[in-house]
């Protein structure tokens, strides 16, 4: 089976190519800081005027689902697209709890002449290692 040609329409880059991505690679857990201002900004973006959140307030799950942790570990090529995700919420995260996020490259595959990378993200409470959320991201990887 021949591999599709890399899609380099977005111009030159010096990032991580599809062939360089190692399935099964796990990156060290990183802090996932969420501040009261982050929570307040989230609600303002929805048009809600709320009082400043207090320590112990539940963090909206949307704020925990991010790919900055992976972008800190590898440089994305131009043209990466978020194709799909699956989220499993296991426990509430509370403002003031130290959170961590770990990343594992779960799979990579070619479908319809397009390259895809699957990575699993796991958010935990650093204090008691409680599982907060797992997210399976599927990204289109152009080259």
Where are these regions (language model features)?
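Short structured motifs
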Residues: 84-90, 104-105
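Low-complexity, compositionally biased segments
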Residues: 22-23, 88, 140
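Residues in flexible loops and secondary-structure boundaries
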Residues: 29, 35, 40-42, 89-90, ...
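Hot-dog-fold acyl-thioester-processing enzymes
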Residues: 1-84
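HotDog/MaoC-like acyl-thioester-processing domains
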Residues: 1-16, 93-143
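Short amphipathic alpha-helical patches
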Residues: 65-69, 90, 117
């Amino acid at each position: 089976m021949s591999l599709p040609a890399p899609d380099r329409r977005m111009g030159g880059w010096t990032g991580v190519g599809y062939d360089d991505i190692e399935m099964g690679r796990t990156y060290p857990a990183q802090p996932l800081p969420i501040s009261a201002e982050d929570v307040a900004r989230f609600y303002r973006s929805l048009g809600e005027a709320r009082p400043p959140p207090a320590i112990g307030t539940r963090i909206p799950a949307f704020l925990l689902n991010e790919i900055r942790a992976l972008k800190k570990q590898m440089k994305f090529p131009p043209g990466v697209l978020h194709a799909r995700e699956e989220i499993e919420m296991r426990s509430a995260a509370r403002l003031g709890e130290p959170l961590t996020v770990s990343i594992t490259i779960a799979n990579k595959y070619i479908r319809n002449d397009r390259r895809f990378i699957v990575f699993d993200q796991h958010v935990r409470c650093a204090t008691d290692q409680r599982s907060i959320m797992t997210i399976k991201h599927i990204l289109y990887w152009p080259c």
